[in-house]
């Protein structure tokens, strides 16, 4: 009893740790703009790694029991497949109704190697998905509700056989089949017309391999696109290889979707820039002449005001500017001294100088008193 209790507790502990981590980082993923499908893939990858390592026994006990049942039913199913093979080829293909209530979904397999496919009902798993309020990515992530089970998941059995587990879109069954080269296709057609069905149709099937169909009773769904026009359903089968005449396009009677109306083109509005009745150039010339006259009058007024305000000060001509001083020092016969008195009679000048220095003919002379005459 202790061993069984221990084996039941360890998988629950690992499962609770995974659930807690995924729930804690969900808000961080959403804040960073990462889709929730990435989070579900991370959870699935984590569980697959733990299951493949075989570190925890009984981590996927329900799946392992189902796999054992699949292995036991391989031989009887093969005989039953050969018995009903021709009967299935004679039945016409059926399309999915508007309210999908199918209980069995079969995946087409190769005709040469008729690998058995066993459908195992799953009554314990509950599908909690609101298809009307979820995006395509969120819907695809919600389809992988069972822990460790994705739309296409590889599971290694105790006998070393590699199987694939497929979760059906209606959440009622598992489909187990041996490892084959298949391609997962998921098509979500959100084109809803008024009066049609209210829930979007979600189709999740496997692309057919070259060959026939799987000899198993039930509804056979080929990879196709389902478009709703009014209350009718239009089914367009799609195949991987080149279509044959037998695979012609099947269309149901109904109203066709209205084509997009071309945008109404408005007549271009052309503004007249120049013409026979245009007199804008003459008006512009008149305005420019008036503007020039106004500028001249303003300049004259400003000049008169400046003349009244900025009058030259008295004795301005007697002031010696810097330029004149520079020219004085550049000349020859320079005298620098003090003076006692200066006499002037018309153009004759008489100087009484003292304590100075003079430069005459390139020579300097120092004096204490000097008298000189000049005319200019």
UniProtKB/Swiss-Prot annotation:
Subcellular location: Nucleus
Coiled-coil region list: none
Biological process according to GO: transcription initiation at RNA polymerase II promoter
Pfam families in the record: TFIIA
Highest taxon of source: Eukaryota
One cellular-component annotation, GO: transcription factor TFIIA complex
Keywords: Acetylation, Nucleus, Phosphoprotein, Transcription, Transcription regulation
Site-annotated residues for Cleavage: 274-275
Modified how: The alpha and beta subunits are postranslationally produced from the precursor formby TASP1. The cleavage promotes proteasomal degradation.
Compositional bias annotation for Acidic residues: 280-329
List of residues that carry N-acetylalanine: 2
Residues involved in DNA binding: 343-344
Location of Phosphoserine modifications: 280-281, 316, 321
Region entry Disordered, spans: 69-107, 246-265, 274-329
Biased composition (Low complexity): 69-79, 89-105
Family under the similarity heading: Belongs to the TFIIA subunit 1 family.
Subunit note: TFIIA is a heterodimer of the large unprocessed subunit 1 and a small subunit gamma. It was originally believed to be a heterotrimer of an alpha (p35), a beta (p19) and a gamma subunit (p12). TFIIA forms a complex with TBP.
Function of the molecule: TFIIA is a component of the transcription machinery of RNA polymerase II and plays an important role in transcriptional activation. TFIIA in a complex with TBP mediates transcriptional activity.
UniProt name for this protein: Transcription initiation factor IIA subunit 1
Gene: GTF2A1
